[in-house]
Amino acid sequence: MILGMIYISPPFGNYISYKNCKRIKGTLTWEKSRGLIKQCIKTIRPVKGGWCNAIGFRNPGMSNIKRFSGSMRRGRDCYSIAALDSNWSPFITQIPHGLPIEINVGCPNVGSYTISDDDIRLFVKHFSELQVKLSPTVDLDYIKRLHSLGVRNFHLSNTIPTDRGGISGYPLKRINLTLV
């Protein structure tokens, strides 16, 4: 018997589905960013104990939310989102409330962006299945602050930043276990 939920993270969650697993799709920005397939082919590579990628946030964009809302079946898929311009308002107001959403605040393959405490509170209010994806370099105080704002689910973590892209797998597991 498996306790808890098994998650399949991006980029693999975009393409692979198993029974009793939740796929995390994305990460999606509000506006479209072309080149996903080319960047996947170009940058996803096996490395010792894991994978390397430099996909960034190439995605179809969430500005046409109707395209995604049909596939956002409660309990099966979760959409990871990021506001590269730190404007979270369209996500809060346009995504149907109650759907499983992951706020990605820790991607090493793009520039920095932020989210305010007020925006976190709004996401917590409108999305009961909210989770936050963190950086492997996250400060424990930041996790405590998010928890005090109502976040109860944390995705540990995004990839380890390197000059070749983000590294996942065993090297990341060693870092994340210290945060559990």
Where on the chain are the PLM-derived regions?
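Active-site glycine- and acidic-residue-rich loops that bind
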Residues: 78-90, 129-147
